[in-house]
Amino acid sequence: MRWWAGAALLLAALLFGRPAAAMEAQPVAYSEFIQDVQARRVAYARITGQRLEAAYRDGTVRVVTLPPGEARLPLVLMQYGARVEFVRPADPIAFRTLLRFIPPLLILGAILWFTRRTAGGSGGLLTMEQSPARLYRVGEASVTLQDVAGLDEVKAELQEVIDFLREPERYRAMGARIPRGILLSGPPGTGKTLLARALAGEAGVPFFSASGSDFVELFAGTGAARVRALFDRARKAAPCIVFIDEIDALARRRGVGAGGGTEEREQTINQLLVEMDGFDSGEGVIVVAATNRPDVLDPAVLRPGRFDRHLTVDPPDRKGREQILAVHAREKRLSQAVALAEVARLTPGFTGADLANLLNEAALLAVRAGEREIGWPQVAMALERVTSGGPPRRVRAAAADRVRAAYHEAGHALAGLALRGSDRLVRVTILPHGRGLGHTLFRDQDEERYLHTRRDAFDRLTELLAGRAAEALVLGEVSAGAADDLERATGLAREMVTRWGMDADIGPLRLEHAVEGEESLRRADGAMRALVAAAERAARALLEARRSGLERLAAALLERERLEGPEVEALLELTPGEKPYIIVANSRGDEGNQ
């Protein structure tokens, strides 16, 4: 900022600066000044154009404006003993020219200052062309495959890459070519970054880590320069691993989207393709990339010879979750009463990051409660916090809202018990959690299922609408409390019609991208509406058939606010595992199983 201050002072001096004598001089009339000259009071005079500065013998300074055409005054001054000095006046044209250049210079200085700041400090524009990757040298990436649990299939696929980095000559002698690139795809939190670090740690090679967004900049050519710099560093450090996280920010499909950054992004992708073509597997540089959205990647990036191997990293199954929990429990004081197998059973769909967060939340709750170790109550409370959007809020709802919430959650619980097959009801509560006034929680009791039939999807749709149906059945009207249920029901109906081919009228077509035109969109919209309406009728029929159970469950919720699964089954007089199946109307209006 020093040069800013200097520029400001210079501008002030140019605009407002004056000689010190002029700042102290007192103006005097021309006629009075002539009298002072004739009285020999003036000792010195300096004439600058029409301006005269006079130093009097008594030490004062006066300034006089000379009349036009006054040529005899210098002779008069010398005649009465005054010394005269002539000063050439400043050129006003040159001064105006200087003022004209000052604003552009100030603007240019501001741009340079802003560029230095956005480029990361003292490096300036040169910093933008440097590799954004962080280098982990051998030994710094202390993670190994032993620290990665629940991903046995993916680890087995990566083992030959590790062997190649350790003993490349064995593969070269056989004429085998190791994959140049490995793409890890899967939902967030499943361990893609951890796998890449473990790969480098296991092989004992340097590890370059960067994010796809690090290569994208405002200035044209910066992304391509950074890609070149990264691969230049990698070649010098070979054998090594280059890891690019969130590669969809860097290698998104070309030709999609518009705007000023499109050309820059395409230049960056082209440079990545050139670099991956420019080295062979013998150099020992292996590119590992991770993404949550492989569908948006450019096809040229995915072709063989670039990313040869595509590995899907899914959320772990029950056995994998138990292994992940065991890894995260190593550094925690976990009570013997906490069975990790039971925690794994209660957490279907959880990723590795979710499980780590669950145990950390339980540890925080144990510290808050003053416990010496993490017990089952803390784990159960942490699970409730994670699944229901936070701890119970200390909000006392109005009596009418509590009644409506009780019937709403009782409807969900009763429909879930009737329709969910082997799933187990964990709890139902009307204590406010997150943004809702209550929630109902089910968990898979047996093996997890990955393929769902049309009947499964329709039953789930019916359960989502059962809370709203219970409000309408008992209280006569619905409320805004079903907004989240409606959002999820709409999404499920859309999947059934446009992706899964579960509508008899639309048929086995995938209309996700609506390539069939407006008529197909209209028919799909009509099919979705019919499906949701049928599910709502089915939910109402189910609750009408078990109206007494609905009333008992709602009354118990109003009294106790929270009921565990076994308590609900006892209240409804169900034997453990019994499911009161009810035949309901399907989306076409006929009766029967779906």
Curated annotation (Swiss-Prot):
The record, for Gene3D superfamilies, names: 1.10.8.60, 3.30.720.210, P-loop containing nucleotide triphosphate hydrolases (3.40.50.300), Peptidase M41 (1.20.58.760)
Membrane topology classification: Multi-pass membrane protein
Q: Which GO terms describe its cellular component?
A: plasma membrane
Organism domain of life: Bacteria
GO molecular function terms noted in the UniProt entry? ATP binding; ATP hydrolysis activity; ATP-dependent peptidase activity; metalloendopeptidase activity; zinc ion binding
HAMAP family per record:
FtsH
Q: What remark does the entry make about the cofactor? A: Binds 1 zinc ion per subunit.
Database matches in Pfam families: AAA, AAA_lid_3, Peptidase_M41
Q: How does it assemble?
A: Homohexamer.
Q: What is its main location?
A: membrane
Q: Which GO terms describe its biological process?
A: protein catabolic process; proteolysis
Q: What does this protein do?
A: Acts as a processive, ATP-dependent zinc metallopeptidase for both cytoplasmic and membrane proteins. Plays a role in the quality control of integral membrane proteins.
Protein name stated in the entry: ATP-dependent zinc metalloprotease FtsH 1
Cofactor(s) it depends on: Zn(2+)
Q: Which family is annotated?
A: In the central section; belongs to the AAA ATPase family. In the C-terminal section; belongs to the peptidase M41 family.
Q: Provide the transmembrane region boundaries.
A: 3-23, 93-113
Location in the cell reads: Cell membrane
Q: Where is the active site?
A: E409
Q: What EC designation does it have?
A: 3.4.24.-
Q: Which UniProt keywords apply?
A: ATP-binding, Cell membrane, Hydrolase, Membrane, Metal-binding, Metalloprotease, Nucleotide-binding, Protease, Transmembrane, Transmembrane helix, Zinc
Which residues lie toward the Extracellular compartment?
24-92
Cite the binding residues for Zn(2+): H408, H412, D485
